[in-house]
UniProtKB/Swiss-Prot annotation:
Residues 321-342 are annotated as: Disordered. The lineage of its organism: Eukaryota, Metazoa, Chordata, Craniata, Vertebrata. It comes from Mus musculus. This is Protein RUFY3. The second coiled coil domain is involved in the interaction with GTP-bound ARL8B. It is found in: Cytoplasm; Endomembrane system; Cell projection, Invadopodium; Cell projection, Growth cone. Residues 321-337 have a biased composition (Basic and acidic residues). The modification Phosphothreonine is found at T5, T12, T51. Phosphorylated by PAK1. Isoform 1 is partially phosphorylated. Gene3D superfamilies: 1.20.5.170, 1.20.58.900.
Length: 469
């Protein structure tokens, strides 16, 4: 791409905007990132000038954006894969000083910044990925906790720092993939913050969100207090992903460790679901106990009312018998009125008796349901205990495999040292052998010279002997 001089010396707003965009994306347009097996390849393209052309160029902006998206996706693949492998080999909880983890956050920051629209403020234009991350709490209620925690952190003063803290807390919560998927699925909300061809708006964003699921096997712990997240410079270190020709192959047992970790994560997830079920059942049991208490109180009130009605009935019977005796001599109409009052009292007593029977039946039903819930709780607690025992066993197996791995690595290192020593000894022996062979050749040559001299002396002696005779 050729660089042309602008027609005027004074920069225009359009010139500043294009120059700023070129400055931010030069690291992506300068190289093409591709995958060679599991290694990174960087292919340098033509030089790119930061001074824009006044005339339309032949470069397609959509092609450049697609190239940037592909580069970022490949970098994210390498970063996530390298982080998982190194974390499993390390075998401990990761902290903020771990280099592969730092590079992962840098790559994620570049992915979130790609195609981000600039917001106009009093100080100029500002690009921050904190705005899209704030939307997650509206889509996933569980994210409200980490958003509130980020806002409460005292040392954060810029939106960039808050976004970086949010990414770290989401990774600690093992929900980063879930949050990113929920955010990417809402393109209509993201369009307020991103350009149409940004990474978060295209298929590459969904692929990266799917790759983040693998990070749920990593345990990370970050201390946000005192860490300067506002002024950190996010530069991708390509040297971590370039192929080393002398790199050694992974030691034996990595497959078994991966299988054990998968089983461990499965058991932990199952244990979490069982705990949630136990909590739900406990809530239902509490509600049933409250309902049972209420029904017991209602039953006691009904019993008291029945006793009162029985007393009233006895009193009414006594009064009726008295009235019958007294009214035998009275008018017939009075006896009819007393009979109606007695029938109404009997009807009222029958209704109260039926109400008592219904309340007792409901109480028996609630008691049986409570017994069933208690039995289900006991079975679930037993299942949880068994799963926890299995989890402990799997962790023990994982520790044994790690110890075996370290032992094999130590033996391999010792054997490599022995082979190296033997190779050095062999080279020294070969050197001595060559020296001895050269000495033997010199001795053979000297022997030949001596034989030749002896023959010469013999012939000379033979010639001298006849002369003396």
């Amino acid at each position: 791409m050729s660089a042309l001089t602008p027609p005027t010396d004074m920069p225009t707003p359009t010139t500043d905007k294009i120059t700023q965009a070129a400055m931010e994306t030069i690291y992506l347009c300068k190289f093409r990132v591709s995958m060679d097996g599991e290694w990174l390849c960087l292919r340098e393209l033509d030089d790119i000038s930061l001074t824009p052309d006044p005339e339309p160029t032949h470069e397609d902006p959509n092609y450049l954006m697609a190239n940037e998206r592909m580069n970022l996706m490949n970098m994210a693949k390498l970063s996530i894969k390298g982080l998982i492998e190194s974390a499993l080999n390390l075998g401990r909880t990761l902290d903020s000083d771990y280099a592969p983890l730092q590079q992962f956050f840098v790559v994620m920051e570049h992915c979130l910044k790609h195609g981000l629209k600039a917001k106009k403020t009093f100080l100029g234009q500002n690009k921050s990925f904190w705005g899209p991350l704030e939307l997650v709490e509206k889509l996933v209620p569980e994210a409200a906790e980490i958003t509130a925690s980020v806002k409460d952190l005292p040392g954060l003063k810029t939106p960039v720092g808050r976004g970086r803290a949010w990414l770290r807390l989401a990774l600690m919560q093992k929900k980063l993939s879930e949050y990113m998927k929920a955010l990417i699925n809402k393109k209509e909300l993201l369009s307020e913050f991103y350009e149409v061809n940004a990474l978060m708006m295209e298929e590459e964003g969904a692929i990266i969100a799917g790759l983040l699921v693998g990070l749920n096997v990593i345990d990370a712990n970050f201390c946000m207090k005192g860490e300067d997240l506002d002024s950190q410079v996010g530069v991708i270190d390509f040297s971590m992903y370039l192929k080393d020709g002398n790199s050694s192959k992974g030691s034996e047992g990595d497959g078994q460790i991966t299988a054990i970790l998968d089983q461990k994560n499965y058991v932990e997830e199952l244990n979490r679901h069982l705990n949630a079920t136990v909590n739900n059942l406990q809530t239902k049991v509490d509600l049933l106990e409250k309902s049972n208490t209420k029904l017991t109180e209602e039953l006691a009130v009904a019993n008291n009312r029945i006793i009162t009605l029985q007393e009233e009935m006895e009193r009414v019977k006594e009064e009726s018998s008295y009235l019958l005796e007294s009214n035998r001599k009275g008018p017939k109409q009075d006896r009819t009125a007393e009979g109606q009052a007695l029938s109404e009292a009997r009807k009222h007593l029958k209704e109260e008796t039926q109400l008592r029977l219904d309340v007792e039946k409901e109480l028996e039903l609630q008691i049986s349901m409570r017994q069933e819930m208690e039995l289900a709780m006991k079975m679930l607690e037993k299942d949880v205990c068994e799963k926890q025992d299995a989890l402990v066993s799997l962790r023990q197996q994982l520790d044994d495999l790690r110890a075996l791995k370290h032992e094999l690595a130590f033996k391999l290192q010792s054997s490599d040292l022995g082979v190296k020593q033997k190779s050095e000894l062999n080279s020294r022996l070969e050197e001595k052998t060559n020296q001895m062979a050269a000495t033997i050749k010199q001795l053979e040559q000297s022997e030949k010279d001596l034989v030749k001299q002896a023959k010469t002396l013999n012939s000379a002696a033979n010639k001298l002997i006849p002369k003396h005779h």
